């Protein structure tokens, strides 16, 4: 699906309403990671250079539909101004006559950042009246917030109903193009790596990927449920008892495509300084828990990853936040960095893992969307993408 982008339309002298994703981590009003703001800069800079008035909308945190200065986008306006090297006008609200006047006064080439759209409960309800008020601030709708594309909210979906021209920003285009090609026309062998704690979060992803991949690697806490489905005793490891039958069905459906761990790092307790050892999957001691894949598994997974032409990774191989149980996840990250094919990291924890390993810049693409990436991998239509124009 080739989306139309800002480059395909005339924006000169137009007010362009851009949904960005500035949902950045803050500590005492200070931005601790500006990755998401940086990711939006190419689209904003293009609009400025083409003589548009860029009106930016975003959410930040979960203010629960009430004004809360803790979640103000003011720090984002300051950081964006530094990145662009020009003034960013910060609006005190995201709707209303005062904001409409402020936007109308801006000359071509200006940037306005609206206050947090989630200060209004109507945003997440996709309230038509609220969406119409947002739409008064622009003539063209640009969605550059892949991270919220799976949400049908007023600023991601509702506002589009009021704008005849609806296109993607460069970040949205990149996400949809790269992940879309991986799922619809991958260079093979195509390998997917699925990890994380729960099978229940990833059932639809696994079902969809089994129809597309050559190999599917399963690690993390969810691997325990699959090992239980294979008949292994799993000690005190996290297992979703109500998903064992589902795991068994997926194993039957996937057959030789699915790779499970053959050894594990187990610990006596869920803490970094607990007693730990490496055991085969058929020898987990009673009362112990699996917290990472073992070295034999890490080597086997790495061999498959390095030989792939397309790799998609969603979810860590273990409790990588604790140093003794990070080796499996970091081994996968290193194998992806060594792989000469297309490597895509999608989903919050895997992104944090490649960044912690210092290997993010060696991936073809690190997705900005957690839940959106997951739903994309499930094969679902994303509301924030479905409303955008497609190239003829």
Curated annotation (Swiss-Prot):
Can you supply one Gene Ontology CC term for this chain's record?
A: cytosol
Give the EC class as a word.
Answer: transferase
* Catalysed transformations (reactions): (2R)-3-phosphoglycerate + ATP = (2R)-3-phospho-glyceroyl phosphate + ADP
Q: Which GO terms describe its biological process?
A: gluconeogenesis; glycolytic process
Residues binding substrate: 21-23, 36, 59-62, 118, 151
Binding residues for ATP: 202, 321, 347-350
Keyword ATP-binding appears in the UniProt entry? yes
Annotated InterPro entries = Phosphoglycerate_kinase, Phosphoglycerate_kinase_CS, Phosphoglycerate_kinase_N, Phosphoglycerate_kinase_sf
Pathway annotation from the record = Carbohydrate degradation; glycolysis; pyruvate from D-glyceraldehyde 3-phosphate: step 2/5
Keyword list (alphabetical) reads: ATP-binding, Cytoplasm, Glycolysis, Kinase, Nucleotide-binding, Transferase
Q: What is its EC number?
A: 2.7.2.3
- Extract one GO molecular function annotation from the record: ADP binding
Q: Which Pfam families match?
A: PGK
Annotated compartments:
Cytoplasm
**Could you tell me which SUPFAM superfamilies the record lists for this protein?**
Phosphoglycerate kinase
- Which family is this sequence assigned to? Belongs to the phosphoglycerate kinase family.
Q: Its quaternary structure?
A: Monomer.
What is the official name of this protein in its record?
A: Phosphoglycerate kinase
Protein's gene: pgk
